[in-house]
Amino acid sequence: MFPSRMSWRWSAALLSLALVSSVRGEAQEAAAPGGREREVMLLTGALLGPTPMVEDLRSLVDEVGGRATGSESNRRSVAWALERFRAAGVPATSEPFRMPALWLEQSASATVQGQGVRFAPRVAAMPFSTATPKGGLAAPLLDVGRGAEADFTRVGTKVKGAFVLVETEELRDVEGLFREYEEAVGIEARAVGAGAAGVVYMGSRPGNQLYRHNVSTGAKNTRPMMVMERDGARRAQRLLRAGIALTMKAALELKTGGPYEAHNVIGEIRGATRPEEVVVLGAHLDSWDLGGGALDNGANVAMLIDLARQLRRLGLKPARTIRFALWNGEEQGMHGSAGYVRSHAAELDGHAMALSVDIGCGRINGFFTNGRPPLVPLVDKALLPVAGLGPFTQVDVPVVGTDNLDFMLSGVANLIANQESATYGPNYHARSDEFEQCDARTLRANAAVVGALAWGFATMDERLPRQGRAEVEALMKATDLTEQMKSFNLWDEWEAGSRGRPAERQVSPTPR
């Protein structure tokens, strides 16, 4: 998602001045009749103030905690979100959808030993890792460097039946995070192809943090795969490079199973004049379970709940219906938003826009418009009232990796909030993803930006039509969307027709 690194500091006074200046200037010219300028000022001003949003984030992170889909804490998060919406006077329901498979870690441990040495570094199973046999799995530990093709060629047949230890760079930013994902595809394919017993990644995070990355092949994976704390992995690597043979015994106990039912939480403020037209504001409720899930994605869940709360409190009535969608199953493949698209298929022609906010707590500096150039001026127009919180740059490339995906594949105009990296990269899916990673002022400013965007799309006269499958296919041919989908193991579902807008039926002429 490649957020930029523009620095941004301000005081509360400067924030207020910037907002007022923006509204008196450009926004005044763009305001439509009927008090829209006043309404957006009321909304953004409220969101910048002392609302319950930050306390909601603390409650979700500290009291509910990590929220892996299928877990008891995830079920509690659904009840938590419903209670927050209803307490704000916002109608809300939980909507069921089908998760294709259950995967939860129950416990993970490892012991490394060789002549005269034995130690037990901490490990975390990677999502979609297989479990080890009862009692654990012991195998030689083999140093394969960075896991490049040349590294596997160097060690040759030694890979077969061994745990391969993969060296990583220490991760400092989002660019490094996406490099990890890209490199893992080749590393894991080479390891499995050579007959490795399993894959052990040296932890890349500062401070010996453990974290979870999905195995690159997802549920098709056939090997135990894990992350080992950085210091322990470096020690093992030094011993191996000193010529000391090592064996590792890993014990990964998992809770796995077939398809099951999970739930999204959908709050709604019904449109006053065009209720059949819908603006979807989405943030995923689930998180991985090592940390509390503040950056990914509790902060943006709290933000959307507060946006709904302030709209209701102020009595603002949008022309279009606004749905506040707290998705589940995002971390395992965006299954909650896919389920919504399937269950609301008959309504999608009326969906004006679907937004995903999912890149942490850094400042929103624009939006991905995902291959829909006509969206750019509409986003620019909606953001005029909060121009003082910018600058904002819209990026018109399709992005895969969050809950805009199934809307994009179904032809609905869709956006992703682009955000500065801030503390996102090193704490992504990590034990350190806790409440302290988020800055309250930035979170409030982001809420104002999303509030202005939402109000703009819910009230403006313009609306982009839904695209057909042929137009989505044209986007795939013109961009790297196909490659992105393949890297996330999503392409087969598109080809099979289980995701995306179905092809238009060809009507045969009636014989005369």
Regions flagged by a language model, labelled:
Residues 11-22:
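Bacterial N-terminal signal peptides
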Residues 29-36, 42, 58, 62-163, ...:
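Noncatalytic luminal/extracellular "stalk/propeptide" segments of secretory-pathway proteins
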Residues 36-71, 97, 209-215, 286-287, ...:
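N-terminal capping segment at the start of a domain
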Residues 37-39, 123-156, 215-294, 306-309, ...:
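Soluble metallo-hydrolase cores and metallopeptidase-like ectodomains found primarily
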Residues 40-48, 62-72, 139-144, 171-188, ...:
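Second-shell loop/turn segments in exported
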Residues 48, 274, 289, 327-427, ...:
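Metal-dependent peptidase/peptidase-like ectodomains
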Residues 183-184, 188-191, 265, 281, ...:
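Alpha-helical metal-binding/catalytic segments enriched in His/Glu/Asp
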Residues 309, 313, 425-488, 497-499, ...:
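His/Asp/Glu-rich mid-to-C-terminal helical/loop segments that flank catalytic regions of hydrolases
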